[in-house]
Amino acid sequence: LIDSSTIDVDSARKASDLARAAGLGVVDAPISGGTAGAAAGTLTFMVGGAEADFASAEPILAGMGSNIIHAGDSGAGQAAKICNNMVLGVSMIAVSEAFMLAKRLGLDAQKLFEVSSKASGQCWALTSYCPVPGPVPTSPANRDYQPGFAVDMMLKDLKLAQQASASAGATTPMGALAESLYALYSN
């Protein structure tokens, strides 16, 4: 059984326990890469489950993706997905704020992109989803802001990350702030 939904870690672990009790092999294998990655066959799968179950699932996942990462036991795929998307959510906000500040300071967006994409500000949110038209031809900003990953989907993942943070006793103030901001963007 391969579960590629993005759900909370505890539910993924419970589903795994139920599947194993029924004699099934199971992995949680949430996906990153969006519709473009699906079309290109370059999806990333973050896989949680027993080593033997991962070995059984890997050839199937390899038909859809180019990055298949065994993150650990049951629930680890979900944990990797929500942690990764928390990084993305926070970095998208930081990149957007930096471009807004640059504009107010009179700095050309292309020049900020050239600097940040070659310096310590380099990140996927900048080089793939730059929020201003021009620097990245394939970004939503150059496609009339047609999303590849909707605000509400990011909000869902940030909520899952905050739920996991509370459950694990982890403090993630930037993740919490990002969740609050995406809730505002969603309305």
Show which residues each predicted segment covers.
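Helical "substrate-binding/catalytic lid" subdomain
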Residues: 56, 76-187
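Rossmann-fold dinucleotide-binding core
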Residues: 3-85
